[in-house]
Regions:
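A generic structural signal for ordered secondary structure
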Residues: 26, 42, 88-91, 123
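Short, charged, surface-exposed hinge/linker loops at domain edges
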Residues: 2-3, 44-100, 104-105, 109-112
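DNA major-groove recognition helix of helix-turn-helix/homeodomain DNA-binding modules
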Residues: 114-132
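DNA-binding alpha-helical recognition surfaces that contact promoter or target DNA
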Residues: 37, 104, 121
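DNA-contacting interfaces and partner/effector-binding or oligomerization modules
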Residues: 1-55
């Protein structure tokens, strides 16, 4: 089975885009699930068109494949805040970064690598806590 690496990002207009790290495929949508579905539709459309027109396409489209999705920390934070699942207060507690700074990241300020790592570490810790509670 072939594994495809894809990255999920949140655009400035609030939509999401998904793109393959090493391939030409991408998708967009108003939610993460919509963007994933759009990319899969694009992959199938590309294969179908390639067969009809007689040009080459990536061989993995004829095989079983899986897509591993990665989302950057800021896009993940935006997703949960916009969905009303987490608040800035809650994210402050899991990351140790004050709400005012988190708000600025949600609104366009790019965090330094250390701050981005702290956000990622906080979400991983939250994931682990939830995993062990429900495992």
């Amino acid at each position: 089975m072939v594994t495809i690496e894809a990255i999920i990002e949140r655009a400035e207009d609030g939509t999401y885009c998904v793109y393959c790290k090493n391939d030409i495929f991408s998708g967009a949508g108003v939610s993460i699930d919509d963007a994933k579905a759009d990319m899969k539709d694009q992959m199938e459309f590309y294969k179908k068109t390639a067969i009809e027109k007689g040009f080459k396409y990536p061989l993995f489209l004829d095989q079983e494949y899986q897509i591993n999705y990665t989302i950057d920390a800021i896009s993940l934070m935006k997703y949960y805040v916009k969905a009303g699942i987490l608040s800035l207060s809650g994210i402050e507690k899991i990351t140790g970064i004050n709400q005012k700074q988190l708000w600025s990241y949600l609104n366009g300020t790019k965090p330094r690598k250390t701050q981005s790592d702290r956000i990622e570490t906080g979400f991983k810790k939250l994931y682990e806590d939830l995993y062990y509670i429900f495992a």
